[in-house]
């Protein structure tokens, strides 16, 4: 199925690792012009080189999402360079799990306010798009209490609430807003790779909770994001798409 993303203009935060990198890859494969950001210049250059020659384009910038003015400037400059913005993907997380004031502040500034500021800066461009889509990457930790309860889970839950509010506020303007909540996702160098090495008992417990017997991949999460980004999902808004291999037990009403 053609997702009709060819020529669409997308912004992705945290686009050099894990789920964010996979999102940039999938959007490029579908023909989108992607602007992505991260904090490491070397990783940005490697990502750009790896994606050269795809159907779409990928251009990276060094941005710290916790820097509000810097984030807004990147969104504006990217929108001007691309002559518009159709898709916004707020993917970055501080991954601040310890229950400390520092973690709470980091989660608030990066996970929640990073999304709020990104959407605010992109709004003038989204309002001019004929297929605007806002996507925030949340987590199953925002839906159920698990080992990441505390700042990480609380801010991921807040993201779902914020984005569903956007969906209702912006529906009349033709702008869709959704969240994707990944389950445990394994990739080299990621959180679960680190847990597997440092706390194999916790890793085994987490793996055993999933009926599929495995963790998800960044590509599986990115595919869900790409569908919500595409005009093919034109009537999907205000939804929290859980992609977890039946990990969570709660019924989402």
Residue ranges of predicted features:
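Alpha-helical segment proximal to the catalytic Tyr-Lys
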Residues: 124, 168-169, 234
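A glycine/serine/threonine-rich, flexible loop-to-helix segment
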Residues: 172, 182-209, 250-253
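Active-site helix of classical SDR
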Residues: 119, 155
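Short C-terminal tail/terminal secondary-structure segment
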Residues: 226, 237-253
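Conserved glycine-rich cofactor-binding loop
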Residues: 9, 16-17
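Short, small/polar-rich loop/turn modules that mediate ligand/substrate recognition or access, typified
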Residues: 171, 176, 236-238
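Residue(s) in the substrate-gating loop at a strand-loop-helix junction
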Residues: 139
